[in-house]
């Protein structure tokens, strides 16, 4: 598998259940991937049962780069899955969409991202499901940016969104980021990130109407300013399920 400098030094694989079928999707970064060389691999385990049989290792077509730091998320209402990765060979962002049967890819969505480093996680994915529309969400670390840099996806079509400028400002170097979807109100999610100043931030994203997406500074201030480390998942979050 792909690594930064030594084995097991970065989150280079992820697994999800399809929400309707219960099929398993395992995606990882193959070590042969590089800048301009497809490094994404996947296997599925159909059936939604503990005794399911894993299919063959498959290389999804059109993916273009290594996938050193990656994340996938399942749509809570369908069999769709969203994928995002940044490679450490070239710092390129690639975005993927699984429709329940096949992967499609948007390569080089951003070619100047922060290069993944040991124990970092510089990309996060999620879904927003509203009354009349659904969007996938990808947040990533753009090079030298203190803003929240993000894409939304409508099925397999990804659109770069205007940067959200957080208050207070977040340091330009990120350590670890994650997205958590609200299991009750599926039209909102929380994005959390640590930065190089040992700060922790939480921001909320809400989908309203047909396609209105609104970020809020739900933390108001840094939740923590003295994290003991900024890498290797230095925080945890969960919605209270009523």
Please identify what each model-predicted range represents.
Residues 1-242:
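Extracellular, repeat-based ectodomains that mediate carbohydrate processing or recognition
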